[in-house]
């Protein structure tokens, strides 16, 4: 059960970048996890690329 919980947490980390990158389904799950780390760095720096991904994510939530 502990392994399943840990796997569920990593799935959340993978799903979030997938929601932000709906058009880029070609990205494998491993790259999705790495992209999560890059996204956090972009949030700290406030790059325009990161802000451009937010509207795409909102579309997915709608």
UniProtKB/Swiss-Prot annotation:
Region (NGE-like): 23-41
Name recorded for this polypeptide: Pro-MCH variant
GO molecular function terms listed in the Swiss-Prot or TrEMBL record: melanin-concentrating hormone activity; type 1 melanin-concentrating hormone receptor binding
Family, similarity comment: Belongs to the melanin-concentrating hormone family.
Region described as Disordered: 28-62
Melanin-concentrating hormone-like: annotated span: 60-62
Cross-referenced InterPro entries: Prepro-melanin_conc_hormone
One Pfam assignment: Pro-MCH
Any one Gene Ontology BP term: chemical synaptic transmission
Coiled-coil stretches: none
Cellular compartments per GO CC: synapse
Species for this entry: Hylobates lar (Lar gibbon)
Spans annotated as NEI-like: 44-56
């Amino acid at each position: 059960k502990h392994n399943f919980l840990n796997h569920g947490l990593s799935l959340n980390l993978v799903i979030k970048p997938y929601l932000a990158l709906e058009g880029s389904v070609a990205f494998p799950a491993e790259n999705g996890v790495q992209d999560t780390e890059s996204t956090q760095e972009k949030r700290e720096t406030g790059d325009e690329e990161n802000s451009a991904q937010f509207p795409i994510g909102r579309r997915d939530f709608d």
